[in-house]
């Protein structure tokens, strides 16, 4: 059966839900698809479908990143429901890196919690350009003054992390009330908060300027073998465009030279695409490449446009204890994990002459040597993590090798 073709009629924007565990991110994601489905602009995706890995449902926390698709009158959206639990922040880093804008979900009765702060900080580090807030579970609070206090606290938190806290839209509502409503009338009062939220997302999150004219690059998130067709790699196109017949290179995560291959097909949401462009989440079919020859963390790129490097200089901000960082300094030879695009790689740190240690809160230029070369270039941002928490954020200032 021929696949349906994906029609590009509206601007495409990548958004995602972030926030503390159990504040309602997954419920809200399901509620958005439900309400927009009433307008024929989405397929309803249930809470259980989003939260669908067996080890998750027992604890009711989301681990995997789930993509859903929906439309408003203005735009086509791909929405990721990001993991909320601190243990799964690793996915948050790779997930938040995919957002043109975030929906921060905060439970009104609880207010901002540690993971709320950590996610806002991460959103800042991975440069999520804009954020709107959904103040959830407001039906459990009847005190208007308390609600206003929670809003004030949220605006202050956002401002402290470099977001324009005074102007960010905060939409109040109940995701559960919308999700559990039996009404098929789009004008039912319990659906209004979802419509208001989508309106805020439409208006406040800017349509991203896509880097379409630059050389093609796509960080690889996943690899699948498809019987009789070959190997498919999936990811979000960072820049440029790709179509059937293009020659591409698989770069990084190896000490060997990049492998060349030819694209034999491009798909988005199970529909074939004439060409994938920057910002699209796509699957790319590769000719003559075995499933074992490609892995998450590599990039697919226009030949010669990016090279793998293991040594680079970087400007790094080391988080303070209050920001969830280290409590103690670190020294030359420190070996944390570097989160670069879709991968984490161990690297050793050298400090500038005369610098003997780095304190939490310092901003420092350091030399990093990764244990395996990765596709990097000047200006690339990354996070530094150890023991399950972010300890620094950095940007590549110069390639050394």
Curated annotation (Swiss-Prot):
<keyword id="KW-0547">Nucleotide-binding</keyword>
<dbReference type="GO" id="GO:0005829">
    <property type="term" value="C:cytosol"/>
</dbReference>
<keyword id="KW-0251">Elongation factor</keyword>
<feature type="binding site">
    <location>
        <position position="26"/>
    </location>
    <ligand>
        <name>Mg(2+)</name>
    </ligand>
</feature>
<keyword id="KW-0963">Cytoplasm</keyword>
<dbReference type="GO" id="GO:0003924">
    <property type="term" value="F:GTPase activity"/>
</dbReference>
<feature type="domain" description="tr-type G">
    <location>
        <begin position="10"/>
        <end position="209"/>
    </location>
</feature>
<comment type="subunit">
    <text>Monomer.</text>
</comment>
<dbReference type="InterPro" id="IPR050055">
    <property type="entry name" value="EF-Tu_GTPase"/>
</dbReference>
<dbReference type="Pfam" id="PF03144">
    <property type="entry name" value="GTP_EFTU_D2"/>
</dbReference>
<keyword id="KW-0460">Magnesium</keyword>
<dbReference type="InterPro" id="IPR004161">
    <property type="entry name" value="EFTu-like_2"/>
</dbReference>
<feature type="region of interest" description="G5">
    <location>
        <begin position="174"/>
        <end position="176"/>
    </location>
</feature>
<keyword id="KW-0378">Hydrolase</keyword>
<feature type="region of interest" description="G1">
    <location>
        <begin position="19"/>
        <end position="26"/>
    </location>
</feature>
<dbReference type="GO" id="GO:0003746">
    <property type="term" value="F:translation elongation factor activity"/>
</dbReference>
<dbReference type="InterPro" id="IPR009001">
    <property type="entry name" value="Transl_elong_EF1A/Init_IF2_C"/>
</dbReference>
<dbReference type="InterPro" id="IPR041709">
    <property type="entry name" value="EF-Tu_GTP-bd"/>
</dbReference>
<keyword id="KW-0342">GTP-binding</keyword>
<feature type="binding site">
    <location>
        <begin position="19"/>
        <end position="26"/>
    </location>
    <ligand>
        <name>GTP</name>
    </ligand>
</feature>
<dbReference type="InterPro" id="IPR027417">
    <property type="entry name" value="P-loop_NTPase"/>
</dbReference>
<dbReference type="InterPro" id="IPR005225">
    <property type="entry name" value="Small_GTP-bd"/>
</dbReference>
<feature type="region of interest" description="G2">
    <location>
        <begin position="60"/>
        <end position="64"/>
    </location>
</feature>
<dbReference type="InterPro" id="IPR031157">
    <property type="entry name" value="G_TR_CS"/>
</dbReference>
<feature type="region of interest" description="G3">
    <location>
        <begin position="81"/>
        <end position="84"/>
    </location>
</feature>
<feature type="region of interest" description="G4">
    <location>
        <begin position="136"/>
        <end position="139"/>
    </location>
</feature>
<dbReference type="InterPro" id="IPR009000">
    <property type="entry name" value="Transl_B-barrel_sf"/>
</dbReference>
<feature type="binding site">
    <location>
        <begin position="81"/>
        <end position="85"/>
    </location>
    <ligand>
        <name>GTP</name>
    </ligand>
</feature>
<dbReference type="InterPro" id="IPR004160">
    <property type="entry name" value="Transl_elong_EFTu/EF1A_C"/>
</dbReference>
<feature type="binding site">
    <location>
        <begin position="136"/>
        <end position="139"/>
    </location>
    <ligand>
        <name>GTP</name>
    </ligand>
</feature>
<dbReference type="Pfam" id="PF00009">
    <property type="entry name" value="GTP_EFTU"/>
</dbReference>
<comment type="function">
    <text>GTP hydrolase that promotes the GTP-dependent binding of aminoacyl-tRNA to the A-site of ribosomes during protein biosynthesis.</text>
</comment>
<dbReference type="Pfam" id="PF03143">
    <property type="entry name" value="GTP_EFTU_D3"/>
</dbReference>
<protein>
    <recommendedName>
        <fullName>Elongation factor Tu 2</fullName>
        <ecNumber>3.6.5.3</ecNumber>
    </recommendedName>
</protein>
<keyword id="KW-0479">Metal-binding</keyword>
<dbReference type="InterPro" id="IPR004541">
    <property type="entry name" value="Transl_elong_EFTu/EF1A_bac/org"/>
</dbReference>
<dbReference type="InterPro" id="IPR033720">
    <property type="entry name" value="EFTU_2"/>
</dbReference>
<dbReference type="GO" id="GO:0005525">
    <property type="term" value="F:GTP binding"/>
</dbReference>
<comment type="similarity">
    <text>Belongs to the TRAFAC class translation factor GTPase superfamily. Classic translation factor GTPase family. EF-Tu/EF-1A subfamily.</text>
</comment>
<keyword id="KW-0648">Protein biosynthesis</keyword>
<dbReference type="InterPro" id="IPR000795">
    <property type="entry name" value="T_Tr_GTP-bd_dom"/>
</dbReference>
